[in-house]
């Protein structure tokens, strides 16, 4: 009975994100990274994609795994479920837009910014991230809105020991069961802002930011 309830709740979450109840279908196994060209949109139509662990990676914390999706500058990824194994999730080479993407079991990372730009994440969710969900390996901005995350290490992490500027914003989201912090940096010039967000079991919202570089308003702890 408990297992059935869990399945029903999971199906309800997917339905609420994509607007329809998905038909039962085997996940698409990705053998080589799917490249979304510059300025184009990839619409997964609610399908589930998993990495071939032999070619992309097993979704562990091992370094140098390959992404399931690679987005070139200005590309958009939407209506996608990334299952397990997720390898290294999504790589953005410059600005990218992520809409209604769900990571069921985050691999090495859910998404990494590899070249400077702005990452806009709207809707979607991420679960079971042993370490971080979104990794910023280049200067830029990450805007997260209407997002759900649970059982994670950190939501956003700037690459450790780097000093470039990253602007992080989180709005109207729900974050729970965090091991470390929602936003973390080692840079004295990076900024973090959290607004209108519900959170539970979060040790600290911000970590490593310089004085005056963080702000919050309208948030609720539950």
Swiss-Prot record:
SUPFAM superfamilies: Pectin lyase-like (SSF51126). It is found in: Secreted. Residues 1-25 form the signal peptide. Its cofactor is Ca(2+). Gene3D superfamilies: Single-stranded right-handed beta-helix, Pectin lyase-like. GO terms for biological process: pectin catabolic process. It holds the Pfam family Pectate_lyase. Optimum temperature is 50-55 degrees Celsius. More than 50% of maximum activity is found in the temperature range 40-60 degrees Celsius. Retains more than 50% of the initial activity after 4 hours incubation at 40 degrees Celsius at pH 10, while at 50 degrees Celsius only 1% of the initial activity is found after the same treatment. Optimum pH is 10. Is stable for 1 hour at 40 degrees Celsius in the pH range 4.0-8.0. Pathway: Glycan metabolism; pectin degradation; 2-dehydro-3-deoxy-D-gluconate from pectin: step 2/5. The keyword Calcium applies. InterPro entries: Pectate_lyase_PlyH/PlyE-like, Pectin_lyas_fold, Pectin_lyase_fold/virulence. GO terms for cellular component: extracellular region. GO terms for molecular function: metal ion binding; pectate lyase activity; pectin lyase activity. Belongs to the polysaccharide lyase 3 family. PANTHER family: PECTATE LYASE F-RELATED. This is Pectate lyase A.
């Amino acid at each position: 009975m408990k297992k059935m309830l869990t399945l029903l709740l999971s199906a309800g979450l997917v339905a609420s994100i994509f607007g329809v109840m998905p038909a039962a279908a085997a996940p698409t196994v990705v053998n080589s990274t799917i490249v979304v060209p510059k300025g184009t949109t990839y619409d997964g139509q609610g399908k589930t994609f998993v990495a071939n662990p032999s070619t992309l990676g097993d979704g562990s914390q091992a370094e140098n795994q390959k992404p399931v999706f690679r987005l070139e500058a200005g590309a958009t990824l939407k209506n996608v479920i990334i299952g397990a194994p997720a390898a290294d999730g999504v790589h953005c080479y410059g600005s990218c837009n992520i809409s209604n993407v769900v990571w069921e079991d985050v691999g090495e990372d859910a998404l990494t910014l590899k070249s400077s730009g702005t990452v806009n994440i709207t809707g979607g969710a991420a679960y079971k991230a042993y370490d971080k969900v979104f990794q910023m390996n280049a200067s830029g901005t990450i805007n997260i809105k209407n997002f759900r995350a649970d059982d994670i290490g950190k939501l956003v992490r700037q690459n450790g020991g780097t000093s470039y500027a990253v602007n992080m914003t989180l709005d109207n989201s729900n974050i729970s069961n965090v091991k470390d912090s929602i936003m973390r940096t080692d840079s004295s010039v990076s900024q973090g802002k959290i607004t209108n967000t519900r959170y539970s079991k979060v040790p600290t919202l911000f970590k490593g930011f310089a004085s005056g570089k963080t702000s919050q308003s309208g948030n609720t702890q539950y």
